[in-house]
Amino acid sequence: GIGLAKQIKNDKPMKFKLMGFISDDVEIKHHHLMGAKVYALDKNTIKVMRDNKITTLLVSPGAINNFRADKEFQDAILAEGIRIYMPTTQEWNTEQQQLKEVSIEDLLPRDEISIDMESVGSMLHGKRILITGSAGSIGSEMVRQIAKYSPAELILIDSAETPQHDIRLMMAKQFPDIKAETIVTTICSKSRMEHIFKTYLPDYVFHAAAYKHVPMMENNPCESIQNNVYGTKILADLAVKYGVKKFVMISTDKAVNPTNVMGCSKRICEIYVQSLNKAIEEGIINGKTQFVTTRFGNVLGSNGSVIPLFKKQIKAGGPVTVTDPRIIRYFMLIPEACKLVLEAGTKGNGGEIFVFDMGKPV
């Protein structure tokens, strides 16, 4: 906390005025540091902040984990309209820390996920990787993470032209040495998909393309079946035909005992790729492709998540609407979801459904 306080005092122009410290260290309670009083973290903390007209709370690197775990204190701070800033994780060990305002994602009470980087790297390095839905929130993060492992080539497929163009620009800027083909097409075009598989002969397929908005698919069930089911069947069949080593399909927890069209469509996809895997293992179908499925729930920041809707409702002054007050939601960050997809792709031997631990309910 001292280092952070020195930094804000030395900032030119000064962005923050140091009014005090909050600490759970009883030995320094009521002392003064750098001319500012040290307050205890207790039931009176919020009143002290209100009396001193505090508008901003800076969280030091050493206090971030405890702060994330203290849901009651977070709620009280936010209820007072106090803005929260903390250093970005990349800068915790540097002398000059860049502060950013805290988002909902930063408050998720969870340690960073670590994966077997060596195994993932050996699987992806020097290989041809095909990613569907590459311009989506999950797909685009998959592109960024996979590109770090120096694949021989990325074949990126999405039907959204402008976001796909953004991916092309991102690849050219951040990964200029990685060969990338950005293709605009629908996975439902069998002839186009066949041409792509025949031309590029991918080693691995990460299938992230899907319609995922539950209410939209309830009103458009034919599109859900066409895109999610038929599109997946086309890709899976071609993966077998053209010798793909591993096909990793991204599914959803809504496929478990599905109660809506979208969940049903994804469950059908799971069953189909598992049946293909079994047929290959039993010698009914000639092929070598291993099919692995990954399931997870709400992803913070995803285009299909409720979080963007909640943010808009909060900014508009409310109310925040939920489908049912009894609903319990679990959330995961996009980067950690994608890391787990890569981990599952590495560890899966075919036929498995990997269900991600979504942590504590929010």
What does each of the following model-derived ranges do?
Residues 1-85, 159-166, 173, 180-181, ...:
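A solvent-exposed beta-alpha-beta segment
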Residues 29, 42, 66-128, 240:
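Flexible, Lys/Arg-rich cytosolic regulatory linkers and terminal tails that connect or flank
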Residues 13-15, 147-153:
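Conserved S-adenosyl-L-methionine
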Residues 184-203:
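Conserved Rossmann-fold cofactor-binding substructure of NAD(P)-dependent oxidoreductases
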Residues 132-135, 140-145:
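N-terminal Rossmann NAD(P)H-binding glycine-rich loop of SDR-like oxidoreductase domains
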Residues 49, 53-55, 151-152, 197-206, ...:
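Proline-aspartate-enriched helix->loop->beta-strand connector
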Residues 237-240, 261-354, 359-361:
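NAD(P)-dependent short-chain dehydrogenase/reductase
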Residues 80, 94, 201, 207, ...:
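Conserved Rossmann-fold NAD(P)-dependent oxidoreductase catalytic core, especially the SDR/UDP-sugar
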